[in-house]
């Protein structure tokens, strides 16, 4: 297999490393306009180019788009026009969605969208518990981390999360909403308030408080921020006879035992991998699982867990939260 990685920053390098773990024989080709990044990947033993046009001549079987979201549309379009099965990181904006979906169908090409949290073992357990409970629940969820700490090796000003269209809070909603909508269902109504409390050089709000009412009667409160000094992912789900707790990592998932009145630890991973450069709530296993899902979709063995069609709805909720018409 020959794989093209477009965008050789931290995420592109992660995809290379994980892809080689899935298939050590895979041939990697990299594309990036920055010479320094190309040199780093060439030192890893991989061929690189400065343009997709050059790389497409190598006839890759699949491509992974790991650039800033605002650049995705143009890149994905070129890849699909070259009939390359394409995996893309979160888009956060719906630029060209209808065109890209139609182009993929016309060229019989896979168009696959990342949604890593759907592959987390803890959230699969929570999803199963909530659906088996089969009654409305209440949930409280806080997700946050101080923006400069996301990529401590570079300035947040040079990172797409400083762009108002793809800002840090929107990125967090883009990561979390797909699993929330899968587990709790479509949204009937929402109310959101936001403001800015930090001294960061940004032109968007840095904290959001959102109340969601789902069509099935479930209600939830979500707090998202780019303020918290310690990375936070805290979830509590409760109903009459159900109480779940999760602190964002595989070592912190609990279900309340109504008989013993104790919290029972739920183990969803035999082993899990973690990149020490990131907070402890980022688990590598989920990234591997979604990449394997993509490769199996290309091979005709599986259906994707997420799609551009589903993401259009997710983005519509994000736009409502941010007050975008």
Please give the residue ranges for each predicted region.
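N-terminal Rossmann-like dinucleotide-binding module
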Residues: 1-44
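Short acidic low-complexity segments
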Residues: 46-58
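Beta-strand-loop-alpha-helix segment that lines the small-molecule cofactor/substrate pocket
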Residues: 62, 68, 73-118
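C-terminal helix-rich "cap/oligomerization" subdomain common to oxidoreductases
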Residues: 62-65, 286-325
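Glycine-rich, N-terminal phosphate-binding loop of Rossmann-like dinucleotide-binding domains
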Residues: 66-67, 143
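Predominantly a Rossmann-like dinucleotide-binding segment in NAD(P)-dependent oxidoreductases
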Residues: 117-193, 198-201
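Contiguous beta-strand/loop segments that form the cofactor/metal-binding neighborhood of enzyme cores
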Residues: 172-252, 281, 288-301
């Amino acid at each position: 297999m020959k794989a093209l990685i477009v965008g050789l920053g931290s995420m592109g390098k992660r995809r290379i490393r994980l892809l080689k773990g899935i298939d050590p024989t895979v041939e990697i080709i990299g594309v990036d306009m920055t010479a320094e990044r190309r040199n780093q990947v060439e030192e890893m033993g991989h061929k690189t180019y400065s343009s997709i046009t050059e790389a497409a001549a190598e006839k890759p079987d699949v491509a992974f788009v790991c650039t800033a979201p605002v650049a995705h549309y143009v890149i994905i379009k070129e890849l699909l026009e070259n009939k390359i099965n394409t995996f893309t990181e979160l888009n956060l904006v719906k630029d060209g969605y209808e065109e890209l979906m139609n182009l993929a169908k016309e060229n019989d090409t896979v168009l696959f969208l990342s949604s890593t949290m759907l592959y987390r073992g803890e959230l699969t357990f929570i999803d199963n518990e909530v659906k088996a409970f089969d009654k409305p629940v209440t949930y409280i969820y806080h997700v946050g981390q101080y923006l400069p700490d996301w990529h401590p090796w570079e300035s947040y000003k040079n990172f797409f999360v400083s762009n108002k269209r793809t800002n840090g809070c929107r990125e967090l909603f883009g990561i979390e909403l797909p699993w929330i909508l899968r587990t709790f269902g479509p949204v009937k109504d929402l109310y959101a308030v936001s403001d800015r409390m930090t001294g960061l050089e940004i032109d968007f709000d840095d904290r959001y408080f959102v109340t969601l009412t789902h069509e099935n009667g479930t209600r939830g409160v979500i707090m998202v921020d780019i303020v918290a000094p310690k990375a936070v992912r805290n979830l509590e789900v409760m109903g009459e006879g159900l109480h779940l707790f999760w602190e964002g990592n595989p070592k912190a998932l609990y279900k309340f035992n109504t008989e013993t009145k104790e919290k029972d630890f739920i183990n969803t991973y035999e082993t899990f991998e973690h990149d020490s450069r990131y907070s402890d709530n980022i688990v590598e296993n989920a990234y591997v699982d979604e990449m394997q899902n993509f490769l199996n979709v290309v091979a005709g063995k599986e259906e994707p867990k997420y799609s551009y069609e589903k993401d259009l709805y997710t983005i519509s909720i994000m736009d409502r939260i941010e007050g975008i018409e």
